[in-house]
A protein has these predicted regions:
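Acidic, polar-rich low-complexity tracts and alpha-helical solenoid repeat scaffolds
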Residues: 2-13, 22-370
Length: 370
């Protein structure tokens, strides 16, 4: 009887305990797991990233790059991997200098290669454009940086046409092409003044064909037409076509009336002005920034070119320049037949080439006595 009372008492104590354990077990299974790293603290990769950005904003570029490289080497699967890679390029870009620009260019290109679909890829391409845009020289200097800027700005528009950087890159491309066109214009004008009219027509025509938004395209056409006129009647058609293009595509030009007079002299029709071209020229004249007196006086000491006169509207040239053929070079045979007295006589007996002795092995004939 004593044993039965003890067992009954034990069961009364054990039953509630078992129920409590079962309930607590179920509650533990459905309780949300708390990551101890995210409770009142930050992820270590984020700590490194925030520290690097703080150093970057304070101008401590070398320290920022060391921290960012530590992040990328330690946490290669971090969500901040792409941002860290871009921040390294930005650190080089802000540091500047020849070394900084070269390193930034390489890092931006790597970022676009590894993350082409990210929004920051368009920003990286825009920075590539700016690296060379800021290093452009004047039109009479080395055009290498301007050509590189043209290439990188084009890439923004072709690879990221819908990005927020596209409108700004388009205007920069117009600025760059203004400088490149002005360089060609200066060379063509030099040839024209020296009387080398064939070279002048080639240079001036190529400048307008490649950069129709050039602020002095009308003057270039006028000099091109004048060069053809001075080359003689043989180039009458080319001169007339050039004057007609000036009247049609640049109707508000100061040279339009002179071009019409030349067309009358050549007895060629005067075309009607293009309404779209007229509207564009009117817009450019109203919105073109005119340099002040101080700007003109200090122009000779400035290293960077003046882009105030660059077009503010219109689609810039998106194709690379084509190699133009000077007007004095004969047209290839596929476009015009060759005229000459050269004749070809076929070999009647092909075996004669093998049977006859080699003339090079025969003794040289004696020279006649004087």
């Amino acid at each position: 009887m004593h044993f039965s009372k003890l067992s009954l008492a034990s069961l009364k104590i054990a039953a509630p305990l078992a129920v409590a354990l079962a309930v607590s077990s179920c509650a533990f299974k459905h309780t949300k797991y708390e990551n101890p790293i995210t409770v009142q603290t930050q992820q270590p990769d984020k700590i490194l990233y925030d520290k690097a950005i703080h150093d970057l904003e304070k101008g401590r570029y070398e320290i920022a790059r060391i921290t960012l490289n530590t992040l990328m080497n330690t946490y290669d699967s971090s969500e901040y991997m792409a941002k860290a890679k871009l921040a390294v390029a930005d650190a080089w870009y802000r540091e500047g200098g020849a070394r900084g620009r070269a390193q930034a260019e390489a890092d931006y290109k790597d970022f676009i290669l590894f993350y082409p679909t990210m929004q920051e890829a368009a920003e990286s391409q825009e920075k590539l454009c700016m690296i060379h845009y800021q290093q452009m020289d004047k039109p009479d200097r080395d055009p290498n940086e301007a050509l590189r800027a043209e290439q990188e700005c084009r890439q923004v528009l072709t690879q990221f046409p819908n990005s927020k950087f596209a409108p700004e890159a388009e205007q920069r491309l117009r600025d760059v092409q203004e400088i490149l066109a002005d360089a060609e214009m200066r060379v063509g004008d030099f040839y024209h003044q020296r009387g080398s009219f064939a070279s002048a027509a080639n240079r001036l025509g190529g400048a307008v064909d490649q950069y129709p938004l050039y602020s002095r395209a009308d003057e270039a056409l006028w000099l091109e037409g004048d060069s053809y006129t001075r080359l003689g009647p043989r180039f009458r058609q080319q001169a007339g076509d050039t004057y007609a293009r000036l009247v049609r595509d640049y109707p508000l030009s100061d040279f339009a009336d002179q071009a019409k007079s030349r067309l009358k002299t050549l007895e060629m029709p005067i075309p009607a002005p293009d309404p779209a071209a007229e509207a564009r020229m009117r817009f450019e004249k109203e919105n073109r920034t005119k340099p002040g007196m101080f700007h003109r006086l200090t122009g000779f000491i400035r290293q960077n070119p003046d882009t105030n006169v660059a077009a503010k509207s219109g689609t810039p040239q998106m194709n690379p320049p084509k190699q133009s053929i000077p007007v004095t070079v004969p047209v290839p045979g596929s476009q015009a037949g060759f005229q000459g007295d050269v004749t070809v006589t076929p070999v009647a007996d092909p075996s004669a080439l093998e049977n006859k002795p080699d003339a090079r092995q025969q003794p040289q004939a004696a020279k006649p006595k004087p």
